Amino acid sequence: MKGLGDSRPRHLSDSLDPPHEPLFAGPDRNPYLLSPTEAFAREARFPGQNTLPGDGLFPLNNQLPPPSSTFPRIHYNSHFEVPEESPFPSHAQATKINRLPANLLDQFEKQLPIHRDGFSTLQFPRGEAKARGESPGRIRHLVHSVQRLFFTKAPSMEGTAGKVGGNGSKKGGLEDGKGRRAKSKERAKAGEPKRRSRSNISGWWSSDDNLDGEGGAFRSGPASGLMTLGRQQERTQPRYFMHAYNTISGHMLKTTKNTTTELTAPPPPPAPPATCPSLGVGTDTNYVKRGSWSTLTLSHAHEVCQKTSATLDKSLLKSKSCHQGLAYHYLQVPGGGGEWSTTLLSPRDMDSTAEGPIPCRRMRSGSYIKAMGDEDSDESGGGSPKPSPKTAARRQSYLRATQQSLGEQSNPRRSLDRLDSVDMLLPSKCPSWEDDYNPISDSLNDSSCISQVFGQASLIPQLFGHDQQVREADLSDQYEAACESACSEAESTTAEALDLPLPSYFRSRSHSYLRAIQAGCSQEEDSVSLQSLSPPPSTGSLSNSRTLPSSSCLVAYKKTPPPVPPRTTSKPFISVTVQSSTESAQDTYLDSQDHKSEVTSQSGLSNSSDSLDSSTRPPSVTRGGITPGPEAPEPPPKHAALKSEQGTLTSSESHSEAIPKRKLSSIGIQVDCIQPVPKEEPSPATKFQSIGIQVEDDWRSSAPSHSMSSRRDTDSDTQDANDSSCKSSERSLPDCTSHPNSISIDAGPRQAPKIAQIKRNLSYGDNSDPALEASSLPPPDPWLETSSSSPAEPAQPGACRRDGYWFLKLLQAETERLEGWCCQMDKETKENNLSEEVLGKVLSAVGSAQLLMSQKFQQFRGLCEQNLNPDANPRPTAQDLAGFWDLLQLSIEDISMKFDELYHLKANSWQLVETPEKRKEEKKPPPPVPKKPAKSKAAVSRDKASDAGDKQRQEARKRLLAAKRAASVRQNSATESADSIEIYVPEAQTRL
């Protein structure tokens, strides 16, 4: 210990100066934001390097005035002071702890979060400790933090392990170890929640909790508590650090010592025996590897701590990924060793076998292993990179509940990369974390490094509940998945930790510290793998998250960005993640809905549900997704949405994660997509419009249709609306199309008259009014046939103008049209010798038209005038007029049908089509016969009867068609409006 302390720059100036020399390389940086007071009187705790005064080992927090820390560090004295509960007893106790069942150790590990990471700057108010309790994400946080702690602790433990037994002072350590250990046991029994209890300490999760507890030792002084890596300096920290850590610190210490010659021989294996008796102190080389690795991590963390908080933020971003790499590395350690071997393998063994036992039993049995093994292994299917559907579903629900967890599942690829970074960590003794991390990044690809670092891949299998014999290849997949989830969660927690007040993010915060420490490595990885950042946060698609390598999901998950200002800087990445989250939310939807969109794939518009889903899920996306948008593109569903956003109607059906820049489709775009879908029938192109417009169109169309079931009213209304909408090239086109389709009867023959009528109508002064123009429909059929055909009605204002004037204009147009037809038919009758039947038809049509104009039209005109007369006592409302007009439309349609027939006859040289016409007449006369006894003795009477029957039939048919059309129009408009409105509102809300 002394040698280590001497060789290493002292983190603690012999005074309580806030800037303490880092354990490693004596980084000049002060602990993040730690006030001098809170900077930990490392000397007090860690008397310097060599001296391990029991009192000096008191947790820095205890020694330091609580208020001094930049972040209100609630002094963890409460929990720190519970020496007996200290999870890290003296070496003897540590040995006991090591002897303790893995479950207890796991519990302790879970509880360990109390350890300060030694980054006092990164203190965040701890949320309810319990809140962190059970979520897999939290477990992963714990795992990662434990891993990080392990890495960081290795160096600090190296300093502390031998002498302090990991308890700060042996005396305090024993007390704390016992008391804490007892409490740890209780916590172990209690489970994760107890670990959460740790958060209770000050109600704040501070990086110090992890790093201080874990890395505080190195800060305080190698001698005092390196083993505990935290502020083990006191029983308080020791409490938090199990002897596993102490052992690790011992092992790591050795490793560090070996790795860094400056680190004098780590305290004799006493710590290792105590901490990892089962592990047994393996070759120093093993320790060296692990130790150096942890040393690097620790030194990185330490340096990070000493760096400015800004550096911390930057490093956090980096270290987030880098640390994930480390954590992933643990997870990924390909190891043949089915279990953590009791003895650490020599570096050669570890290198050769990649199965070297994990240096720390804590690593072996740590709850983080369980968390990783149970959750990740389950999710990863014990070897499969992807979680089982059940696991994924569980994750999704759990992630939804704890958005933080989403990150867990999103970083499979990145985790491997980062894990690889561990290799670099191993070799470097106390290089600047940036330097180390850059090489680490370079070496990230070496799984062997990971295996070396971890010694045993077996840990990974354990973590994943995977066959311990699984090799790197399999493990890498599993680990990617598990690490992805775990690391992504860690990242998410880190991201959250950045924000963090979230209690569950303590680990992540600690991770973020390590990540910050390892920022260099993680930066490369982060930048290298947009996937890791861009992978859509698991939020949207937990299932996708596996495929999505990014751990960026972390961000998305954090619904509550904690106020931690220093972390805020890192948050941008989180934001990126958020973008991804949104995307992943979309991905989830888009996965299902991209298929939908593919199915619907209307102009490739993203489904409203997709956009809604994505927008809904990622409130955080909205928040943070902005930056990461490009990275987020991974979810192809989002990609589809993105295309729509770009305005590309091409459905981006591909769920390809290839589009890294996939952006959340704007609500408007998605809305557009949505609208086309609701419009079903209408051409998507026309429907592709802003929802608001569509809604109005629908409303306008629907309003008239609602006012009257009469198809004519609907037609006229739709005609008006459709004319305007057609002009606007919106869904009106489909409507118009439907109307023309609705009536094709004799359209050809009538077209000329219609045109003439239109011209005639146009000639009228009223035509200037759009309503009048609209009314200047060709023959009545045009109402049915082509509501859109009426060019005269360009203005939807008609809908707004539905008053007496508007209806008068419509009435005038209809009157003129009917009069024109009547005049034309009279002329035709005079000019041509028509058969009695034809004459009867002509007379019937003309008479019906004249009767309608003379009676109902006049009545309607009177109603319109009354409507225009404010003084009219029974003054009819526009709705009344619309209803009456609907009734008139029925009559007009009947007459129009008659004139259509006449036009057909005219086209046929006024020759009745015997076959069809007479057959129809004959067929129809029978009904008339029953209704009206077939006593007609004259052909005329028969013609009349046939005409009457035909007329009735036609009228019935017309009414039926009108009703169907009106219903269809209303249904379409209602559906469109409803869909567009529903979608639009959610979309807007989501966007908001």
From Swiss-Prot:
Main location per the UniProt record: membrane
Compositional bias of kind Basic and acidic residues: 1-20, 172-194, 915-925, 940-958
Modified residues (Phosphothreonine): 915
GO biological process: modification of postsynaptic structure; regulation of synapse maturation; signaling
Listed Polar residues bias regions: 199-208, 576-591, 969-978
Protein location: Membrane
Membrane topology, record value: Peripheral membrane protein
Coiled coil spans: none
Keywords recorded for this protein, A-Z: Membrane, Methylation, Phosphoprotein
Low complexity bias: start-end ranges: 528-554, 600-620
Residue list for modification Phosphoserine: 206-207, 377, 380, 384, 388, 405, 415, 421, 580-581, 609, 611, 665, 744, 973
CC per GO annotation: cholinergic synapse; glutamatergic synapse; membrane; neuromuscular junction; postsynaptic specialization; synapse
Function, in words: May play a role in the molecular organization of synapses and neuronal cell signaling. Could be an adapter protein linking ion channel to the subsynaptic cytoskeleton. May induce enrichment of PSD-95/SAP90 at the plasma membrane.
Subunit relationships: Interacts with DLG1 and DLG4/PSD-95.
Similarity remark: Belongs to the SAPAP family.
Protein name: Disks large-associated protein 4
